[in-house]
């Protein structure tokens, strides 16, 4: 009788564990769906483009500082940030010190951003230090 009770208790524990796992899975799935819905409703394609441009601009400044593609800024360039117009089609990249940003460096940064992000150049205008 004692072994029979142990088997019943063990099976009940397993049943509770299985039910808890299904409950946890259902809560996790509902959370993922809610977050996904929230993000898709609150962030547009333009928001993603701005995020991609910002990441590419940071990388371009790092590459320019390292002498990539023969660029020699003579000082350490500092990525200062990004801003954009109301319609999010004009994107401005700020790099300092401004006096050391040559047209060659500007062209490299802008072309690097367009090449990496694959955004439409006729739709989005990127300017360095406007």
From Swiss-Prot:
Keyword Ligase: no
Alphabetized Pfam families for the sequence: Class_IIIsignal
Keyword Repeat carried by entry: no
Span(s) of short sequence motif QXSXEXXXL: 15-23
Principal subcellular localisation of the protein: secreted
Keywords, sorted A to Z: Fimbrium, Secreted
Proregion positions: 1-14
Top-rank lineage group of the source organism: Archaea
A single cellular component GO annotation: membrane
Domain characteristics, as noted in the entry: Contains an amino terminal motif QXSXEXXXL, which is part of a class III signal sequence.
Name recorded for this polypeptide: Probable pilin MJ0835.1
């Amino acid at each position: 009788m004692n072994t029979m009770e142990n088997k019943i208790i063990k099976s009940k524990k397993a049943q509770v564990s299985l039910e808890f796992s299904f409950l946890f899975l259902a809560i996790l799935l509902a959370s993922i769906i809610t977050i996904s819905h929230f993000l898709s409703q609150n962030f547009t394609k333009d928001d993603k483009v701005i995020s991609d441009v910002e990441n590419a601009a940071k990388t371009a400044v790092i590459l320019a500082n390292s002498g990539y593609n023969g660029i020699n800024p003579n000082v350490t360039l500092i990525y200062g940030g990004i801003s954009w117009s109301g319609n999010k089609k004009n994107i401005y990249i700020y790099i300092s010190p401004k006096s050391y940003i040559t047209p060659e460096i500007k062209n490299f940064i802008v072309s690097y951003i367009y090449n990496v992000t694959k955004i439409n150049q006729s739709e989005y205008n990127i300017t360095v230090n406007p």
